[in-house]
A protein has these predicted regions:
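FNR/FR-type flavoprotein reductase catalytic core
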Residues: 31-170
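A residue-level signal for beta-strand positions that form part of recognition/binding surfaces
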Residues: 21, 44, 196
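A generic structural signal for residues embedded in beta-strands
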Residues: 1-2, 47, 183
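Local cysteine-cluster metal-coordination motifs and their immediate loop/turn environment
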Residues: 74, 146-147, 168-203
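Short, charged, solvent-exposed linker or helix-capping segments at domain edges/interfaces
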Residues: 120-121, 196, 208-211
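Residues in well-ordered beta-strands of folded domains
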Residues: 15, 25-27, 46-48, 92, ...
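Ferredoxin-reductase
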Residues: 1-41
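Iron-sulfur (Fe-S) cluster-binding modules
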Residues: 4-11, 62, 84, 88, ...
Length: 213
C-alpha cells in the first residue's frame, strides 16, 4: 500500500456503512485539505479518533438537527443513524447561496441567506417553520459556524428546548495536551468561567453552558 504524509486535519464523518467503511466530508481551505481531496484508492491513512464526546439523544422523542457549512457532514451522519433506529428527526440546513448547497435531501428544510434556493434567511427562518408540540421532549443539535450556533442556542432557549452544540475548534494534538482547542464555558468559580478542551470534554456541549463571544 502507498503511504503519504500530510499535516493533521480535523475530519468529519459523513456516512457510515455496516461493512466498516465510512465517507468523510472535506472542504478545501488550505494545503492539508487540498492534499486530502486528492487521495486515491489504496492510500494508507493514519487516523486518530473518534475524539471527545458525542450527541446524547436519550430521553427525547423528537430531534432537530441543524447544520451549516461543513457542519452538514456530521448532521447527515446523525440523521442516517437516528432514522435507522426509528427516531423522529427533522433536519434544517443553512447555506449562503445555492452554489454551496450540499447533502440536501427532499425531507430536509433548506435555507439560503440570499433566498436563491429554499427559504430565504438563516437557519432560524427554517426552524420557525417547525411545529414543536412538546419542547421538553424535543432536542435540538447544531453544528456549524459560531454565529449560527449562537443564534440557534438563543432560539432553543426561547422555545424552552435543550440544545447541544458541537464546537469546531481545531484539534492540533488530539490528546488534550496542547490546549489549542479550548472552549470557554460557565463555571461557579471566582472567574465565572473555565476553559475546557474540545478533544476531551467536548466537542459537544450544552449550549447554555457555552460563553458565546
Amino acid at each position: 500500500m502507498k503511504k503519504q504524509k500530510v499535516d493533521k486535519e480535523d475530519i468529519l464523518i459523513m456516512t457510515y456503512a455496516e461493512n466498516g467503511t465510512f465517507n468523510i466530508g472535506v472542504k478545501v481551505v488550505g494545503k492539508g485539505t487540498a492534499e486530502i481531496s486528492q487521495f486515491e484508492p489504496g492510500l494508507l491513512v493514519d487516523c486518530l479518533g473518534p475524539l471527545g464526546n458525542g450527541f446524547d439523544f436519550e430521553g427525547y422523542d423528537n430531534v432537530i438537527l441543524t447544520g451549516g457549512g461543513t457542519g452538514v457532514f456530521p448532521i447527515n451522519f446523525a440523521y442516517e443513524t437516528l432514522t435507522s433506529n426509528g427516531k423522529n428527526v427533522t433536519v434544517c440546513e443553512g447555506f449562503r447561496n445555492a452554489s454551496q448547497v450540499i447533502l440536501n435531501k427532499p425531507s430536509y428544510i433548506l435555507t439560503t441567506d440570499c433566498g436563491d434556493c429554499g427559504i430565504k434567511g438563516t437557519v432560524i427562518a427554517g426552524l420557525d417553520t417547525i411545529d414543536i408540540s412538546d419542547p421538553s421532549k424535543t432536542l435540538i443539535c447544531c453544528v456549524g459556524p459560531i454565529p449560527m450556533m449562537k443564534a440557534v442556542s438563543a432560539w432553543a432557549d426561547e422555545k424552552g428546548m435543550n440544545c447541544l452544540v458541537s464546537m469546531e475548534q481545531r484539534m492540533a494534538c488530539g490528546a488534550g495536551i496542547c490546549l489549542c482547542c479550548t472552549v470557554k464555558v460557565k463555571d461557579e468559580g471566582s472567574d465565572g468561567f473555565k476553559n475546557v478542551r474540545c478533544c476531551k470534554e467536548g466537542p459537544v456541549f450544552d449550549s447554555r453552558e457555552v460563553i458565546w463571544s
